């Protein structure tokens, strides 16, 4: 598999809400965010999920994941950190690769590891 093919297979999942991260247009740049940031995508009264990742952070993470793939250390359960982004490879098959992420700079510590319905 080429690096380009590898990158196209990656799907980022919010580590707080277990939802697929969305590519969104910010004021100056594109970025990924949890869909539960938007009020329409969460139950009434639930706080917004602040998990997000810039394109720069995404590219650094993809570079790290590609290096792991090249070194034959890439497998489900692979965990690590790239800057403020903590990641874990969840699923790997012929069609896609899911990577769960939490940006520790944008997500409150007390939210990490808790059931989102409690927040």
Please provide the spans of the model-predicted regions:
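Basic, low-complexity terminal or inter-domain segments flanking catalytic cores
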Residues: 1-119
